[in-house]
């Protein structure tokens, strides 16, 4: 995956409750990202990935977001989602590698070993929320680790990826052997540049590029609140 090294990956996602929810639209969004210089795409769902791959010749990080009533993990968190994604053949499959509760009480070790046994050649990315989770995923053998879920899990509540000059990223990089793909609320070009300087393999940026309703809200909130926008 040298194609994305030191470069930008754009996350093109729109969930069912969002105005741009459409595989066609995500395909065009990927074209726009490519024209802007993106070196890769992150996408959610088999349909979106297939459409994106028909429109751009860029490596894809594929996921399936699916909520289970009994679990907290939700990004490609069972073999069902992995099997579905293999139909679309993304270059990398990202899975929930947090310590959050999983379906049926399955452990991350068990899940990881199942994937490796069935699809030994598939590149895997660990979406994590803490330094400890990323270090653990690295030791398990994930090809890439990522701080994607910082602030989105019970164990990372209140944490922000940019705190103390990206301390979470710096602390993790000092302890891992596999490359890190930085992702999660990296919402300015300056932040993206900084994490590359710190030594990450690549950086993923999503909402600030591809979710116009959220971009608009930032402008509206700042106008109405005298320089501050609501998170």
Where are the regions that the model predicts?
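Conserved N-terminal beta1-alpha1 strand-loop-helix module at the mouth
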Residues: 1-87, 118, 124, 132-144, ...
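C-terminal alpha-helical cap/extension of soluble enzyme domains
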Residues: 6-20, 162-231
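A short alpha-helix capping/helix-coil boundary motif
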Residues: 6-10, 27-29, 60-62, 90-92, ...
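A cross-family glycoside hydrolase active-site/sugar-binding cleft signature
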Residues: 11-13, 44, 61-63, 96, ...
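Glycine-rich phosphate-binding active-site loops on the catalytic face of alpha/beta enzymes
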Residues: 13-15, 64, 68, 88-102, ...
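Active-site-adjacent beta->alpha loops and helix N-cap segments on the catalytic face
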Residues: 20-23, 42-61, 73-79, 97-115, ...
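Short, surface-exposed, polar/charged, turn-prone segments marking secondary-structure boundaries
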Residues: 36-40, 69-72, 88-91, 120-123, ...
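Short, structured secondary-structure boundary patches
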Residues: 60-67, 81-85, 115-119, 146-149, ...
């Amino acid at each position: 995956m040298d194609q994305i090294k030191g470069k930008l990956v754009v996350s093109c996602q729109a969930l069912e409750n969002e105005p741009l929810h459409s595989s066609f639209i995500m395909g065009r969004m990927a074209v726009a990202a490519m024209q802007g210089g993106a070196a890769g795409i992150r996408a959610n769902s088999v349909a979106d990935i297939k459409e994106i791959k028909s429109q751009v010749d860029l490596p894809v990080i594929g996921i399936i977001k699916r909520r289970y009533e009994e679990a907290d993990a939700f990004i490609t968190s069972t073999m069902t989602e992995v099997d579905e994604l293999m139909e679309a053949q993304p270059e990398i499959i990202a899975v929930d590698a947090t310590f959050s509760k999983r379906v049926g009480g399955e452990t991350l070790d068990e899940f990881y070993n199942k994937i490796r046994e069935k699809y030994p050649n598939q590149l895997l990315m660990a979406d994590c929320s803490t330094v400890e989770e990323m270090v653990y995923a690295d030791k398990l053998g994930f090809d890439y680790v990522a701080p994607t879920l910082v602030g989105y899990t019970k164990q990372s509540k209140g944490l922000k990826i940019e705190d103390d000059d990206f301390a979470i990223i710096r602390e993790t990089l000092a302890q891992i052997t596999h490359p890190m793909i930085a992702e999660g609320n990296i919402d300015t070009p300056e932040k993206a540049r900084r994490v590359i300087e710190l030594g990450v393999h690549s950086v993923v940026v999503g909402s600030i590029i591809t979710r116009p309703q959220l971009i608009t809200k930032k402008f509206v909130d700042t106008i109405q609140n005298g320089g501050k926008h609501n998170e």
